């Protein structure tokens, strides 16, 4: 009888402890494949060479829009370091990771830049004038002041942000400003990031949808990124800008398995070459692939533009 009572008590105690243990265990991500230093050196050399680039807009490293605080990644699709190695440029939608605000994303960014040669771009906004900022000791508000001085001050603030956060350039999202304002801003950036500026290795990029940026910006722009979303019928064609500076981006938000990106990767102008191709919402292609490989479409597009050399 005593033995039966003892077994019953132990059983009930075990069940009680099991019931209390409701905290789910943290899932360990499968480790990424590690490569030799020779591989990474070859990767950095490739990205430093003249080739058609892959440019992506990536947001899943950060909390969802409107949320704040730290995000605990649930998969490599939510990690910067999980992006394909051969991507050249990553536009950081949703802000800029810092050691204080997003420690995992920040460390991923630093490691990816140093080890893989990937460059990271600040998303500047030329779609509206709701910008309040301070630069050179003076506060500006573009919603009420759109003078040449204020527009050029915004460009300096953008450049200052890029430098202070250790990023590699700025992308002006041209979807609302008039052409003269964009021209002033890009010309001002050239004074800082251009060949005669203090930071000549920083990039100046303009992405656009329906209205083409003024050709007056051509001497100062490293890349024009055309929002060539296939569901809206957009296609290739530099719209008056140099072909070698034009990058065509599909939207994986609408076409997560690739859409027109393979055609953009294969297309070439009659003479010379295009700047490259890429995708908005590249994270949507992490799971949605036709071949079962994470980011399968973007990997295939890179191979179409720049086939791997046979050993």
Where on the chain are the PLM-derived regions?
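Chitinase-like catalytic core of GlcNAc-active glycosidases
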Residues: 49-264, 274, 282-283, 288-292, ...
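Solenoid-like repeat scaffolds
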Residues: 268-269
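C-terminal helical cap(s) of enzyme catalytic domains, especially alpha/beta-barrels
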Residues: 287-311
């Amino acid at each position: 009888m005593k033995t039966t009572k003892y077994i019953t008590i132990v059983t009930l105690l075990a069940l009680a402890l099991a019931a209390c243990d409701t905290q789910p265990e943290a899932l360990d991500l499968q480790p990424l494949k590690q490569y030799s230093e020779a591989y990474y050196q070859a990767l950095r050399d490739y990205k430093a060479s003249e080739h058609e680039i892959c440019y992506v807009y990536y947001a899943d490293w950060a909390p969802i829009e409107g949320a704040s605080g730290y995000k605990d990644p649930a998969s490599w699709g939510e990690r910067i370091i999980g992006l394909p190695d051969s991507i050249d440029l990553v536009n950081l939608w949703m802000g800029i990771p810092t050691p204080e605000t997003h420690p995992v994303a920040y460390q991923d960014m630093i490691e990816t830049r140093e080890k893989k040669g990937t460059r990271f771009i600040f998303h500047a906004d030329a779609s509206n004038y709701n910008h309040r900022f301070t630069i050179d000791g003076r506060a500006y508000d573009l919603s009420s002041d759109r003078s040449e001085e204020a527009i050029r001050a915004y460009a300096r603030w953008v450049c200052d942000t890029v430098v202070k956060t250790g990023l590699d350039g700025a992308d002006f999202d041209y979807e609302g400003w008039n052409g003269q304002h964009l021209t002033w801003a890009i010309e001002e950036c050239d004074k800082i990031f251009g060949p005669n500026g203090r930071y000549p290795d920083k990039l100046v990029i303009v992405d656009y949808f329906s209205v083409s940026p003024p050709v007056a910006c051509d001497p100062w722009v490293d890349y024009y990124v055309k929002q060539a979303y296939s569901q809206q019928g957009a296609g290739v064609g530099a719209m008056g800008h140099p072909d070698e500076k034009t990058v065509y981006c599909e939207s994986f938000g609408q076409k997560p398995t690739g859409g027109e990106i393979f055609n953009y990767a294969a297309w070439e102008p009659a003479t010379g070459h295009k700047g490259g191709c890429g995708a908005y919402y590249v994270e949507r292609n992490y799971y949605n692939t036709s071949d079962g490989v994470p980011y399968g479409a973007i990997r295939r597009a890179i191979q179409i533009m720049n086939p791997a050399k046979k050993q």
